[in-house]
């Protein structure tokens, strides 16, 4: 596929994906979902990857879904549009390696929902966050009502969802919506640093710990603990054994 909206760039074992529709503040449309589906199924499936970074070009991460594309949809078409977006974002969250949202500027509506589908979020201090759908007489359609309370708690989530108010980066950090805040000019440097730290760890362990943590969050503690024990054991005789030997021998592991 020839990408027109996404700009994927391989940097060693990292994949940097820039959403490049700055003239529309990177608003999400059908073409975006087509390209992201292809990227996740192909570029992001490379076993040599250690992390994926998603960011936006220009003044916004993503300012929301493309309202001009949605306005004339029938209820049936709107449901299909919602289901399609949910599937794409689910594929992002279930990608084998960690996915980091580098949030510059506005992350609103569908843009915040995409950020929620990532494993964690790093923001510049001029970023703004919100689920403003109620201002248009709508609700989120890409699982925002489900992921947001799971991440920040029911009270803060319902406040954002029912008021449509925007949060500053400082507020987002306070409630756990983002993990770090930087100066705008330092955002990508910090995200690349974090991705580099991840790349230095045992790659099989990183993939497994993401899988077990996400899967375990959806089942009982007993079921999640069983999954953890099974996954823990898979690393013995492989990279886990190499890592422990390297520690004892005071050398760097050879993954």
Can you name each region flagged by the protein language model?
Residues 32-35, 81-84, 114, 187, ...:
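Hydrophobic alpha-helical membrane-association signature
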């Amino acid at each position: 596929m020839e990408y027109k909206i996404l700009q994927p760039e391989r940097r060693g074992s990292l994949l940097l994906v820039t959403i490049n529709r700055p003239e529309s503040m990177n608003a999400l449309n059908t073409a975006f979902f087509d390209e992201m589906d292809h990227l996740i199924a192909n570029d992001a499936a490379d076993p040599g990857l250690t992390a994926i970074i998603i960011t936006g070009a220009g003044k916004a991460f993503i300012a929301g879904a493309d309202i001009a594309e949605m306005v004339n949809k029938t209820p049936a078409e709107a449901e299909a549009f919602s289901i399609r977006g949910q599937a794409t974002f689910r594929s992002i969250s279930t990608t084998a390696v960690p996915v980091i949202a580098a949030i510059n500027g506005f992350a609103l509506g569908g843009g915040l929902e995409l950020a929620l589908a990532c494993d964690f979020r790093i923001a510049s201090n001029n970023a703004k966050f919100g689920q403003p759908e109620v201002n248009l007489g709508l609700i989120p359609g890409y699982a925002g009502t489900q992921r947001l309370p799971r991440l920040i708690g029911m009270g803060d989530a319902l406040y954002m969802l029912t008021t449509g108010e925007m949060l500053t980066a400082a507020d987002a950090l306070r409630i756990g919506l983002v993990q770090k805040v930087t100066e705008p000019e330092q955002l990508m440097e910090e995200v690349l640093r974090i991705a580099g730290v991840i790349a230095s760890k045992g790659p099989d362990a990183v993939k497994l710990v993401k899988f077990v943590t996400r899967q375990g969050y959806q089942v009982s503690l007993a079921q999640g603990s069983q999954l953890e024990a099974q996954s823990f054991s898979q690393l013995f005789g492989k990279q886990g054994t190499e890592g422990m030997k390297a520690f004892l021998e005071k050398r760097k592991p050879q993954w």
